[in-house]
Amino acid sequence: MYTFDYLVFIGRFQPFHLAHMQTIEIALQQSRYVILALGSAQMERNIKNPFLAIEREQMILSNFSLDEQKRIRFVHVVDVYNDEKWVKQVKSLVNGVIEPNSKVGLIGHFKDESSYYLRLFPEWIMVELDSLKDSISATPMREAYYRGEIQTEFFPVGTIKFLDEFKKTRTYQKLQQRFEQDDRSNLDEIE
């Protein structure tokens, strides 16, 4: 018997690492379904958000069994830079994939001041996690990736394979150039 019908996990997952995976594994133990709210889901790539939402879905699912994959749902959250509008968007997207009268919770970890958004959903029961995998941050992982290194100690196998394949693309080369030039603008075209 599960404590929740749905647990919502909000993140950019750029890329999906072991602390993310550990959070989902905990969520799957406590909930029938896990809803991953993929942040920064607009169709633009830049060095902070190199992967499109559909690519992140593939990267994430590749790390789970078929039975687990059936229990993971995705919603795509576009950046709006207004907390009230953003919360409304997240709630609307989540309500679009849950059954009526479901018990919904929010799972996460208050790692730093950027985690304040976890307090914006008082109607969802909070499942607060202690520090996971030494509170690893994806920023230095992305930076190493742009230098050509995949830090395998921080990633599950499916992510490693995804990153390895993505390195072979023209998009990766463009992102790598942007990183070297410290250019945070969006790539012009979607590939």
Predicted regions span which residues?
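Nucleotidyltransferase catalytic core that binds NTPs
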Residues: M1-E191
